[in-house]
Amino acid sequence: MEQYKFILSGGGTGGHIYPAIAIANELKSRFPNCKILFVGAKDKMEMQKVPQAGYDIKGLSIAGLQRKITLQNAMFPFKLLSSLVKSFGIVQQFKPDVVIGTGGFASGAVLKVASILGIATVIQEQNSYPGITNKLLSKKANKICVAYENLEQFFPKDKMILTGNPVRQDLISVDGKRNEAIDYFKLDANKKTILILGGSLGARRINQLIAKEIDWLLSQNVQIIWQCGKLYFEDYKPFSGKENVQILSFIDRMDLVYAAADIVISRSGASSVSELAIVGKPVIFIPSPNVAEDHQTKNAQAIVNKQGAILLKESQLDSEFKFVFESLLNDKAKQEDLSKNIKQLALPNATKDIVDEIIKLVESQKS
């Protein structure tokens, strides 16, 4: 069997890293002797998470543009040029059959270099509103795997395939894990469990909200699992002294925490939205306003338009959060409707479908 080679690039947050790892795992399961190399951004979380998953990674000195004038922005052109030069070296030395980008600081440089060198590229666009980098790269990409319908205004229609976003395979069957989850997190089986998710790095405004309202929330006879993110863990750790509250910087067993959850309060990054659709939990999305193209609001709105979630903007939290949360908590029919509707939007075979497209691309080149 021919030994295929693949470069995967994506990072900065878990939402870009875990889809890339899921794709790598599926490629490895189909082609056990294939070679896989990751390219990420130095000092970002992929430099730890990818080796933990068993793959080699090279780091580029690249970071995104800030929204205000900073020294980092002044350095951006030099870092971009340096990353392009280093990407040339990496791609030419490794000689991949296909380069796959899942978003993040490094993937733009690697995909650009691959397309210049005539190497096949696949973009995995996770959001309902693509960023400028992927829009530019799409002109030369061979395939664009998307997670939302109606993206023809951004990408060439003949290159697009609706696949969904890769999610951890252990999330596909969480329904039967509730008892295990209750034991694992030492929960009270008679109380509703509220899961607070701020993404891998944490969400400052959601953390502030929960800290302010925690006594009121607990008065609703619920228990709380609060993933505050590694950036904020020390600030909010003291709340773990309260009864029925667990504070976690990061959650390793997402399958069990979803199985335990009755209601989820979450950011609406692409991976979070895809995971919540797979597990089918009633969710209140609080999008981050501090992301490119306001894509989190657009991701959440795409689900709300199908009656699959509730959307609260950060500007609405002080005036509306209590009413919205209490109304949902006390309305079993509403919870069931949201669960049913969001689950209908799930694309559980995304990883397999993306790898199918990658293999078609490889085989078309060899023929």
Swiss-Prot record:
Q: What does this protein do?
A: Cell wall formation. Catalyzes the transfer of a GlcNAc subunit on undecaprenyl-pyrophosphoryl-MurNAc-pentapeptide (lipid intermediate I) to form undecaprenyl-pyrophosphoryl-MurNAc-(pentapeptide)GlcNAc (lipid intermediate II).
Q: Which reaction does it catalyse?
A: di-trans,octa-cis-undecaprenyl diphospho-N-acetyl-alpha-D-muramoyl-L-alanyl-D-glutamyl-meso-2,6-diaminopimeloyl-D-alanyl-D-alanine + UDP-N-acetyl-alpha-D-glucosamine = di-trans,octa-cis-undecaprenyl diphospho-[N-acetyl-alpha-D-glucosaminyl-(1->4)]-N-acetyl-alpha-D-muramoyl-L-alanyl-D-glutamyl-meso-2,6-diaminopimeloyl-D-alanyl-D-alanine + UDP + H(+)
The family classification in the record reads: Belongs to the glycosyltransferase 28 family. MurG subfamily.
The name on file for this protein is UDP-N-acetylglucosamine--N-acetylmuramyl-(pentapeptide) pyrophosphoryl-undecaprenol N-acetylglucosamine transferase
Q: Which UniProt keywords apply?
A: Cell cycle, Cell division, Cell inner membrane, Cell membrane, Cell shape, Cell wall biogenesis/degradation, Glycosyltransferase, Membrane, Peptidoglycan synthesis, Transferase
Predominant location category = membrane
GO molecular function, a single term: undecaprenyldiphospho-muramoylpentapeptide beta-N-acetylglucosaminyltransferase activity
Picking any one GO biological process from the record gives: cell wall organization
What metabolic or biological pathway is this protein involved in? Cell wall biogenesis; peptidoglycan biosynthesis
Q: Which positions bind UDP-N-acetyl-alpha-D-glucosamine?
A: 13-15, 127, 168, 200, 251, 296
Record GO cellular component, one term: plasma membrane
In what way does this protein cross or attach to the membrane?
A: Peripheral membrane protein
Does the keyword section mention Glycoprotein?
Answer: no
Q: What is its EC number?
A: 2.4.1.227
Q: Where in the cell is it found?
A: Cell inner membrane
Name the InterPro entries on file. GlcNAc_MurG (IPR006009), Glyco_trans_28_C (IPR007235), GlycoTrans_28_N (IPR004276)
